[in-house]
Amino acid sequence: VFDTIPAGSGKVTGTGTTQITINPAGSLASDTAYHVTIAASAFDDALSNSYAGISDATTLNFVTLDTIDPTLSSSSPADNATGVGINSNIVLTFSEAVDAESGNIIIKKTTDDSTFESIPVGNSKVSVSSNVVTINPAGTLASSTGYYVIVDATAFDDPSGNSYAGISAKTALNFTTGDSINPALSSSTPTDGATGVALNTNIVLNFSEAVDVETGNIVITRTSDSAVFDTIPVGSGKVTGTGTTQITINPAGSLASDTAYHVTIAASAFDDALSNSYAG
């Protein structure tokens, strides 16, 4: 019950006329169904003939105007999410059904506020299904990079024309993409094509980022006849430096004098912390 109003109270006016006005004590809720019941003893005419009243829920019922703006209930990625895929869609879930109106959704880079992509809400890259809006950027996000999303206040309305306030703050919906870049070999000792290499030298591999030892072999082969000098499982004690950018390989024996060798590395040998693999 929203309000019970005695017919004789000051909230009921118009006695002695054909029009009765009822003034409830408070404001009705937005977008809400109500019905009115009236006691059969509430109103009489001048000859004491009584109005029959209303006792059911259908004779006098109504729905109030929706005056509540839609709000953002959740998003994917969530605010402050990390490890987001570089090809991810942005999904906005609202408190009620919305329609795309006008304006843009803008994806910006956190470091310098540069615009990665500005997408008009009427574009086919923005799809609306009831209260869910899916944004499919045209490009691929950069790896290990912070972004934030701006939504114009004119972008989405509910069916009653109430507008979503939009997103204007840099910190309201921001996320960081995951590392999707494979580690690369930056340099080595000996260098490729080196001559005069010491017979007892270790092989040192310097990577573009820290790597972990995984599985597979490092094989040192004599180039002239493809004879294998040493096959070294990466998990053996002869391979050190896991978790760093520098891997050191200590062959079991001494290399032959004045002999050309080449090194092969399994593609499964080294991964970075997010399991991106060195190509080998």
Task: Report each predicted region and the residues it spans.
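Solvent-exposed, conformationally flexible loop/turn segments
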Residues: 15, 31, 85-87, 144, ...
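Acidic, Ser/Thr
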Residues: 25, 95-97, 138, 208-210, ...
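Short intrinsically disordered, low-complexity coil segments enriched in acidic
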Residues: 1-20, 130, 279-280
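Short beta-strand segments enriched for Tyr within beta-sheet-rich domains
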Residues: 34-38, 94, 145-151, 207, ...
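Acidic, Ser/Thr/Gly/Pro-rich low-complexity segments and short DxT(G/T)-type signature motifs
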Residues: 1-5, 28-30, 39-83, 104, ...
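Short, surface-exposed alpha-helix to beta-strand junction/turn motifs within ectodomains of secreted
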Residues: 1-12, 41-44, 58, 86-126, ...
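Aromatic sugar-binding surface patches on proteins
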Residues: 14-22, 128-135, 241-249
